[in-house]
């Protein structure tokens, strides 16, 4: 089985399908840092499959450059990543590149089984609308509909029309349901149906599939009308883990401190083992704490104490006047928030973490800092051997925008079962 990944980001959705044995025809992504992440991950997968994983860990240890890493795998491994913005002007060239890749793989029989991905969702994201409102005013339904980003689904449909996959997966935020008073979502489903697909959607919470985070996403699945396919059955995962199970084995850090290397201070928790977040021999990377102002650390400690006392989210207005820096407190009431370490799932990871970490404060009062890239990646269920290229800010953005691999794997498992039943 193979797939094309559109608007691929850092590859969270793709990771789930790769784990279930799907082959990547192409990853199409406009962000250059995310594309480097995709290429690095493709190198990891190739080297792992060919018993040469030591070369990858040399790269993580800084003993090999990225260029040397890429040179150690066949060109076609990294050429699956297409660093181009999908637009009417570029789409023909993207098709040509994908067609050449398909021709190079006779085992695919000239066919694409699956297309996955979700266009950027900033224009109708609830978070985006809240931020817009805080600065100015709410977007009108007309503005939401007219935002050019909201028509990227038509670019997605161009790929469906070109390659006629058996099924597709279209992912987005819950805000897509209500954008333009529901008109936008209705148009999307109609468009899919005109291409010969039956479609269904569900709101899925990643916390039901092993991710220690409440992260709701709309997952549309489509299948060719004449087929026997249907919306995949997803098996929920029951557990008694807490968020601390992905934090407590990592070295404790003060703000500005680096904890990378080979050693961790704690034992592997059952969660880390069950979901292969941390493997024996992994190299710890990207565990570097941001510098923090002393005032912010004092705020963090108050927030942590309030949570530890009675699970209260302390509001900005409740802080002593000496710690407040904003005259207008209404829009900053929830500016600071604790990662709920003793709960089975924390609040939703968002890309804003790239700007500051106030909304993701580590629950350990002795550290009193915002979380690191590696901690954010674990909250999203990325394994420790997943390296995010482009520096800390770029890494946080990629992680905050990603589909958690464990959610993606649950979807992939359900779809794979249908393909196997056909054989």
Predicted features along the sequence, with ranges:
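Core alpha/beta nucleotide-donor-binding catalytic domains of modification enzymes
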Residues: 2, 8-164, 174-178, 183
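Short, acidic Gly/Pro/Ser/Thr-rich loop/turn segments
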Residues: 122-126, 227-228, 255, 354-359, ...
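Short Gly/aromatic-enriched secondary-structure transition segments
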Residues: 41-42, 52, 236-237, 364-367
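Class I S-adenosyl-L-methionine
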Residues: 105-108, 126-323
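Conserved small-residue
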Residues: 9, 38, 115-118, 156, ...
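C-terminal target-recognition/interaction regions appended to catalytic cores
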Residues: 271-423
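Short alpha-helical segments and helix-capping/turn motifs at coil-helix boundaries
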Residues: 94-105, 203-207, 331-335
């Amino acid at each position: 089985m193979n797939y094309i990944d559109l608007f691929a980001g850092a590859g969270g959705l793709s990771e789930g399908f790769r784990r279930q044995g799907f082959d990547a025809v192409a990853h199409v992504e406009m962000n250059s840092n995310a594309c480097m992440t995709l290429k690095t991950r493709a190198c990891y997968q190739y080297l792992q499959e060919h018993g040469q994983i030591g070369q990858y860990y040399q790269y993580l240890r800084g003993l090999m450059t990225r260029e040397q890493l890429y040179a150690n795998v066949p060109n076609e491994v990294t050429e699956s990543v297409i660093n181009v913005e999908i637009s009417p002007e570029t789409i023909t060239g993207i098709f040509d590149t994908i067609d050449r890749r398909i021709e190079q793989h006779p085992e695919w029989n000239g066919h694409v089984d699956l297309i996955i991905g979700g266009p950027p969702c900033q224009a109708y994201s609830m978070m985006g609308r809240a931020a817009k409102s805080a600065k100015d005013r709410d977007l009108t339904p007309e503005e939401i509909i007219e935002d050019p980003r909201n028509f990227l689904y038509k670019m997605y449909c161009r790929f469906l029309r070109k390659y006629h996959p058996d099924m597709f997966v279209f992912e987005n935020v819950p805000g897509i349901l209500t954008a333009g008073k529901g008109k936008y979502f209705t148009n999307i489903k109609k468009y899919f149906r005109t291409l010969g697909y039956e479609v269904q959607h569900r709101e899925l919470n990643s916390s039901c599939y092993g991710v220690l985070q409440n992260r709701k996403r709309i997952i549309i699945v489509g299948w060719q009308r004449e087929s026997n396919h249907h919306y995949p059955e997803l098996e929920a995962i029951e557990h008694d883990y807490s968020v601390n199970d992905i934090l407590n084995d990592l070295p404790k850090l003060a703000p500005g401190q680096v904890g990378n290397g080979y050693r961790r201070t704690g034992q592997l928790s059952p969660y880390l083992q069950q979901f292969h977040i941390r493997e024996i021999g992994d190299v710890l990377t990207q565990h570097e704490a941001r510098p923090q102002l002393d005032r912010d650390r004092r705020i963090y400690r108050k927030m942590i104490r309030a949570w530890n006392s009675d699970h209260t989210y302390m509001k900005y207005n409740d802080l002593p006047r000496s710690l407040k820096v904003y005259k207008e407190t209404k829009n900053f009431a929830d500016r600071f928030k604790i990662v709920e370490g003793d709960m089975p799932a924390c609040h939703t990871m968002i890309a804003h973490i790239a700007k500051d970490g106030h909304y993701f404060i580590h629950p350990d009062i002795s550290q009193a800092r915002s979380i690191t890239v590696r901690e954010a990646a674990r909250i999203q269920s990325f394994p420790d051997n997943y390296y995010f290229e482009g520096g800390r800010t770029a890494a946080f953005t990629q992680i905050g925008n990603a589909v958690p691999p464990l959610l993606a794997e649950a979807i992939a498992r359900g779809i794979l079962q249908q393909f196997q039943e056909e054989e």
